[in-house]
């Protein structure tokens, strides 16, 4: 009989069924560009830049902006931000620029235009008389792109957080090399009318293009990135968390994965390290793949690699990291099991280090040290997991190896020890927990544990 089937009786009739559940119907799309064509969008007719500036500035002051007009202006304004490419710039086989070439953000992408006129062709901007300077254009571009960052601020950030962020960004665009073009608090007022603009594909595309350009090219107006920096590694929280994790515990990616003792990691690790992607290539299209429309559903998000994400932040929570305590638990990815493994890994890497002499007074001392090390015989006793570290707080846990950690988990029946629970409760109870956060999960799960 099929191993996946179960047998039972209904009204004395033998029934055999194969239990099946709803599966994810969406396919993850990897961002690799295989046709060697630059990311592309289509916008309306290119505007007269000065007339467009006047129209959009008038719209900002009235807190009434048309996203199509804004996108058309942002694309046209790219010509104002010319810079020199410091090195040959290539990504996914696409030559963006050669070293020494003069380039603008428009060189990174393909912007196609239609004959459809924007609203500025009909009205707007009549209250602005003089033609704007480049600095004024740069200020307007910066303020418009700040709308993207503001629309990405999480709703969990309460109080005046968003207002304070908006005010600080406004201050940037009213000091040299920028110039003040709007009154105080105008940006926040405008944002309230454009609160969901991060979901507009063309606006997101242009924000990512500007960010990719200014992250590579030294420019007088590079501070424009203050509004676009959130497009870098957007929807990559799983991969970003893993990268931070291996740096935190001072292991290579390969070494860290050896500690992932759960079958559900297999598919996620395979997904996260799909060949052919430029995850480790500086200034690649990969960094901005989400905003540039290269992937509809990111294979690197926290939901795509939820077990990995949960484990990493349970370890981070064990170590008392605020970022991990505030992160949102992926409830569908075995958080209870991940908290157990996170406790053991947290214990393994928290408050311990691997140290060795690396610097010496002279060559003679270095040679003597190397000779001693080469002849030294280490007698490493295998950790049988029988030492009760609950009673021996200073117990080091033996050698730092995946085998030793796995043995301790098995000897303890796959359960947390008192010391783990005590640590989890300590870090979570002293933290103001956000809804659905790791701090809240740990506090609710283990604060009343009798162990």
Swiss-Prot record:
Modification after translation: Phosphorylated by host.
Major location category of this protein: virion
Residue(s) carrying Phosphoserine: 389
Effect of residue 44 to E: In strain: Isolate Holland/9018/1987, Isolate Holland/9375/1993 and Isolate Holland/94112/1989
Outcome of substituting residue 126 to Q: In strain: Isolate Holland/9018/1987, Isolate Holland/94112/1989, Isolate Holland/9375/1993, Isolate Switzerland/02053/2002 and Isolate Switzerland/9337/1993
Phenotype upon changing residue 281 to I: In strain: Isolate Switzerland/9337/1993
Effect of residue 174 to A: In strain: Isolate Holland/9018/1987
Claim: Ribonucleoprotein is one of the keywords in the record: yes
GO MF annotations, alphabetized: RNA binding
Source domain of life: Viruses
Phenotype when changing residue 205 to S: In strain: Isolate Holland/9018/1987
Phenotype when changing residue 134 to P: In strain: Isolate Switzerland/02053/2002
Location in or out of the cell: Virion; Host cytoplasm
Keywords: Capsid protein, Helical capsid protein, Host cytoplasm, Phosphoprotein, Ribonucleoprotein, RNA-binding, Viral nucleoprotein, Virion
GO CC term (a single one): helical viral capsid
InterPro entries in UniProt: Rhabdo_ncapsid, Rhabdovirus_ncapsid_C, Rhabdovirus_ncapsid_N, Rhabdovirus_nucleoprotein-like
Family to which this protein belongs: Belongs to the lyssavirus nucleocapsid protein family.
Function comment: Encapsidates the genome, protecting it from nucleases. If expressed without protein P it binds non-specifically RNA and therefore can bind it's own mRNA. Interaction with protein P abolishes any non-specific RNA binding, and prevents phosphorylation. The soluble N-P complex encapsidates specifically the genomic RNA, with protein N protecting the genome like a pearl necklace. The encapsidated genomic RNA is termed the nucleocapsid (NC) and serves as template for viral transcription and replication. Protein N binds protein P in the NC through a different interaction, and can be phosphorylated.
Assembly and binders: Homomultimerizes to form the nucleocapsid. Binds to viral genomic RNA.
Name under which the protein is recorded: Nucleoprotein
Organism of provenance: European bat lyssavirus 2 (strain Human/Scotland/RV1333/2002)
Lineage, uppermost ranks: Viruses, Riboviria, Orthornavirae, Negarnaviricota, Haploviricotina
């Amino acid at each position: 009989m099929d191993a996946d089937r179960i047998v039972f009786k209904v009204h004395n009739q033998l029934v055999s069924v194969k239990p099946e559940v709803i599966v994810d119907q969406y396919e993850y799309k990897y961002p690799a560009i295989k046709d060697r064509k630059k990311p592309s969008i289509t916008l309306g007719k290119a505007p007269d830049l000065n007339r467009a500036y006047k129209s959009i500035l008038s719209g900002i002051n009235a807190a009434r902006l048309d996203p199509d007009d804004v996108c058309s202006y942002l694309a046209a304004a790219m010509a104002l931000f010319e810079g020199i490419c410091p090195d040959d710039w290539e990504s996914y086989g696409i030559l963006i620029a050669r070293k020494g070439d003069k380039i603008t953000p428009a060189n990174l992408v393909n912007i196609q235009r239609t004959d459809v006129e924007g609203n500025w062709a009909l009205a707007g901007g009549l209250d602005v008389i003089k033609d704007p300077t480049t600095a004024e254009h740069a200020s307007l571009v910066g303020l418009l792109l700040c709308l993207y960052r503001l629309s990405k601020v999480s709703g969990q950030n309460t109080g005046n957080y968003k207002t304070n962020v908006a005010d600080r960004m406004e201050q940037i665009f009213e000091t040299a090399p920028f110039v003040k073009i709007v009154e105080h608090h105008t940006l926040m007022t405008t944002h309230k009318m454009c609160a969901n603009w991060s979901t507009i594909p063309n606006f997101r595309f242009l924000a990512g293009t500007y960010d990719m350009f200014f992250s590579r090219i030294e420019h007088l107006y590079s501070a424009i990135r203050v509004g676009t920096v959130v497009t870098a590694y957007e929807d990559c929280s799983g991969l970003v968390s893993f990268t931070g994790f291996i740096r935190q515990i001072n292991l290579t990616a390969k070494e860290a994965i050896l500690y992932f003792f759960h079958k559900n990691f297999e598919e996620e690790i395979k997904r996260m390290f799909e060949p052919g992607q430029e995850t480790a290539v500086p200034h690649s299209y990969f960094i901005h793949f989400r905003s540039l429309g290269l992937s509809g559903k990111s294979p690197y998000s926290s939901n795509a690699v939820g077990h990995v994400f949960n484990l990493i932040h349970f370890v981070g929570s064990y170590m008392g990291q605020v970022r991990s305590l505030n992160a949102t638990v992926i409830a569908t990815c075995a958080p209870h099991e991940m908290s157990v493994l996170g406790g053991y890994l947290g214990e393994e890497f928290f408050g311990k280090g691997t140290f060795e002499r690396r610097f010496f007074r002279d060559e003679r001392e270095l040679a003597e040290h190397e000779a001693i090390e080469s002849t030294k015989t280490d007698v490493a006793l295998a950790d049988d997991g029988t030492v009760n570290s609950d009673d021996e707080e200073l117990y080091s846990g033996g050698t730092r190896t995946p085998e030793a950690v796995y043995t301790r988990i098995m000897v303890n029946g796959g359960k947390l020890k008192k010391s783990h629970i005590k640590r989890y409760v300590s870090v979570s109870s002293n933290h103001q927990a956000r809804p659905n956060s790791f701090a809240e999960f740990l506090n609710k799960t283990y604060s009343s544990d009798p162990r």
